[in-house]
Design a protein with these regions (language model features):
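S-adenosyl-L-methionine
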Residues: 1-135, 143-148, 155, 213-215, ...
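Mobile, glycine- and charge-enriched loop segments
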Residues: 50-52, 57-58, 67-69, 73, ...
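Short internal loop-to-helix segment that lines adenine-nucleotide cofactor pockets
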Residues: 86-110, 170-172, 186-243, 254-257
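Conserved acidic-Pro-Pro-aromatic motif
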Residues: 106, 127-134, 209-305
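Short N-terminal helix/helix-N-cap motif within the alpha/beta-hydrolase-1
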Residues: 118-121, 143, 169, 230-234
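Conserved SAM/SAH-binding beta-strand->alpha-helix loop
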Residues: 138
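Core alpha/beta nucleotide-donor-binding catalytic domains of modification enzymes
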Residues: 146, 150-178
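Short aromatic-enriched loop/helix-cap "lid" or pocket-rim segments at secondary-structure transitions
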Residues: 170-174, 185-186, 261, 282-285
Length: 305
C-alpha cells in the first residue's frame, strides 16, 4: 500500500516537473507545510518528491531552527537534505550530532567537508566569538555554502574552496550528478550514486592547517568527507597530537577498521552518537547514525553531559 501511494504521488509530481516554470511554482506551494506541526508525515512527502527528477529551480531561502534557540535562513534544493528547510520548522538533520554539540564551547573550529554550510552556520550562531574555518572542495556545494553564510551574516566563518589530503596540490574530485552532497575524492564511493562529474580541486595538507591552530585554545575538528576520514586524520596527525582537539567524525563503509588502525586515536575515548544519547565504544563500527564524537582521555570529565 505504501509503495502504491509513493508511486501515485510520484506520478502526480512528474507533471509539474516537466518544465522549470511549473516545477518552481509547484514546489513553492509546499512552503505552506511550514505552518503545520513537524512530524514523520513531512518526511513521507519529501520521499515522494525525491522519486522525481526535477529541473534545476531556484527556491527562496527559508528560516528554520537548526538547534534549540538557534534559527537561520537556508536556501533549499529539492532532492538535497537542505530541502527540509522548505517544509520543516525545525530541521530534522542529524539530531544526535546537534545534541552532542549543544552544551559545548570552542574557540577554534575546523570543519572539513562543510558542504552547503549547515554546521558552519550553526557554529557561527552558537559560538559568535569562535573562529570557524570551513573547507569544501565541491564547486556547487561551496557556492551554496557562501550563499548561506551571507544570508546569516556569519562573519566569524572563513571558507576555503579546497580539499584536505596527505599532500598539498591538486586532486580529482568526483561529484555525483544527482547527489551533489555526496561528492568525494573516492571515485568508487561517488559512483555508487550514479554517473559523476570529475573536476580538479586544490588540496591542503595537515601542515598548512596547523597554522590555523591557536595553541591552548579549545578546538573542535569535524570531518565529513565521504570515506576519506582516515586519510585526513593521518594528514592531521601532528596537529591532533599537539592540540588534542575534540573531534566529530562520520564513519561509513570500510572506514571503521581503517580508523581502528590509527594508533594516535587510541588516546581518545569514542562515543557513538545515537538517537537515545551518546554511547561509549571501544572501537569504531558502522552504525545507522554513522557519527562518532572523540574526546581526549585527559579531558574526559565533561564528555557526557
Amino acid at each position: 500500500m505504501q509503495q502504491r501511494l509513493l508511486a501515485m504521488s510520484a506520478a502526480i509530481h512528474r507533471i509539474p516537473a516537466s518544465s522549470v516554470w511549473s516545477a518552481s511554482l509547484y514546489l513553492r506551494m509546499f512552503r505552506v507545510l511550514k505552518y503545520l506541526p513537524d512530524g514523520r508525515w513531512k518526511r513521507g512527502i519529501e520521499r515522494t518528491l525525491e522519486e522525481v527528477r526535477w529541473p534545476e529551480v531556484s527556491l527562496p531561502s527559508s528560516r528554520a531552527e537548526l538547534a534549540p534557540g538557534f534559527a537561520a535562513r537556508l536556501v533549499p534544493h529539492v532532492g538535497e537534505f537542505d530541502f527540509s528547510a522548505h517544509l520543516y520548522r525545525r530541521m530534522p538533520y542529524e539530531p544526535e550530532v546537534r545534541s552532542w554539540l549543544a552544551e559545548r564551547s570552542y574557540d577554534v573550529i575546523i570543519e572539513i567537508g562543510a558542504n552547503v554550510g549547515f554546521y558552519s552556520v550553526l557554529f557561527s550562531l552558537m559560538l559568535p566569538e569562535a573562529r570557524i574555518y570551513s573547507f569544501e572542495p565541491a564547486q556547487t556545494a561551496f557556492r551554496r555554502l557562501l550563499e548561506n553564510l551571507a544570508l546569516n551574516k556569519c562573519k566569524n566563518v572563513v571558507p576555503f574552496k579546497c580539499a584536505i589530503a596527505i599532500h598539498a596540490g591538486f586532486l580529482e574530485f568526483y561529484e555525483p550528478k544527482d547527489h551533489l552532497t555526496n561528492g568525494s575524492l573516492d571515485r568508487a564511493f561517488a559512483e555508487a550514486f550514479g554517473s559523476v562529474n570529475v573536476t580538479r580541486v586544490p588540496s591542503l595538507s595537515g601542515n598548512e592547517l596547523g597554522a590555523l591552530a591557536e595553541h591552548g585554545k579549545r578546538m573542535l575538528i569535524k570531518i565529513d568527507a565521504e570515506g576519506l576520514e582516515p586519510q585526513i586524520l593521518c594528514s592531521l596527525k601532528s596537529l591532533i597530537i599537539a592540540e588534542r582537539p575534540d573531534m566529530i567524525i562520520e564513519v561509513i563503509h570500510d572506514v571503521p577498521e581503517q580508523l581502528n588502525d590509527i594508533e594516535f586515536l587510541r588516546e581518545y575515548r569514542l562515543f557513538q552518537l545515537l538517537p537515545e544519547g551518546p554511547k561509549e565504544a571501544e572501537r569504531f563500527t558502522q552504525t545507522k547514525t554513522r557519527d562518532y564524537a572523540l574526546v581526549p582521555r585527559a579531558c574526559i570529565a565533561d564528555a557526557v553531559m
